[in-house]
């Protein structure tokens, strides 16, 4: 995968398409559509009986999935950032206070969160490792954008959980002055590149949500 190719740790995972026979040897696991985000189609599967339904849900949104071990109580840390004129600008590192799992509605339709995030200090070594992992993930692929990376720390080792582009990257509560940051990025965008636009997955989401 991309993260491993740039030297960033990830949890062991298995990749399946909708044509594969999916086998899980140990539970619990977390099951995710490959090309989506925002917890759409994601399930925590605690036993074999729950697996078939979770697969049906995920394959409504995508034709490929990944399955990872689900580690209850693992520490997760969020870092957002961008690069302007060759220099990285980082948010604070936040440890989100949350329930076991946040679905799409809780992430984007729950407006109860109004305060700024509280910064967490993990010590120089882990703070640096998280930022270096972010840089490795950002360089070349995300030039000119703001992204948020969510990391796990397990036994003092940093692992990537996921990379969030829009809308998850717009974590304005992580920055002291998000408007100023946004203006800097908008004023220093790289040379325009032609990006193919494909609404295939938007259409899949609409169809699946309507069922």
Q: Predicted segments — roles?
A:
Residues 1-73, 131:
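Active-site nucleotide/adenylate-binding loops and adjacent lid/helix of ATP-dependent enzymes
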Residues 8, 143-144, 178-180:
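Helix N-cap/coil-helix junction residues
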Residues 38-39, 115-116, 169-173:
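Short small-residue beta-strand/loop micro-motif enriched in glycine and branched aliphatics
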Residues 46-125, 153, 158-159:
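Phosphate-binding site of ATP-dependent enzymes
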Residues 52-59, 105, 130-138, 182-186:
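A generic alpha-helix structural signal
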Residues 112-121, 127-147:
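Internal helical hairpin/lid segments
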Residues 138-165:
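C-terminal hydrophobic structural anchor segments
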Residues 157-211:
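C-terminal active-site "lid" helix and adjoining low-complexity regulatory extension at the edge
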